């Protein structure tokens, strides 16, 4: 059992490191695209396979939901990559705690990230009609973290001992 927990911890660390890297790169792409309209990122493979186009769209900030509800100047209307950095750091840090509260928080934030991934995936497919390799990669990371967090939560539930 301890071997499985150690392996899950290593996997979590790798997933979170990859997530932070992808999120930081998405912030870089967005910043460069705002500075120079001719900027072309490494993830821009074709006109309909362009992460720059996705990150520069209205859905590239606040999941496309914050601005219509809270306004363009809202403190929550940040690039989606900023949410990603916070999410992956939180997952990595809380993952080092063995507490039940950490397990519940990890699961809750993972479910939220899965819902956000489904929303943004639908926007990609039906709204933008674009393929964003970086986005799809982060959705995969989110799904893997959700799987880890469900298993961890189940382990905490079965380890509970009656008083």
Region locations from a protein language model:
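Membrane-interfacial helix-loop segments of redox and metal-homeostasis proteins
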Residues: 2-163
């Amino acid at each position: 059992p301890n071997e499985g927990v150690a392996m899950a911890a290593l996997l979590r660390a790798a997933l979170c490191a990859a997530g932070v890297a992808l999120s930081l790169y998405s912030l870089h792409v967005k910043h460069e695209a705002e500075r120079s309209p001719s900027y072309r990122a490494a993830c821009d493979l074709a006109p309909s396979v362009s992460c720059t186009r996705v990150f520069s769209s209205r859905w590239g900030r606040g999941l496309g939901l914050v601005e219509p509800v809270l306004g363009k100047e809202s403190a929550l209307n940040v690039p989606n990559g900023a949410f990603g950095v916070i999410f992956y750091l939180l997952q990595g840090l809380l993952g080092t705690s063995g507490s039940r509260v950490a397990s519940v928080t990890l699961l809750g934030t993972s479910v939220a990230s899965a819902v956000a991934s489904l929303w943004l995936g639908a926007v990609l497919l039906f709204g933008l009609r674009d393929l964003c390799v970086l986005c799809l990669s982060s959705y995969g990371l989110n799904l893997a973290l959700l799987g880890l967090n469900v298993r961890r939560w189940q382990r905490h539930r079965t380890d509970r001992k009656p008083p």
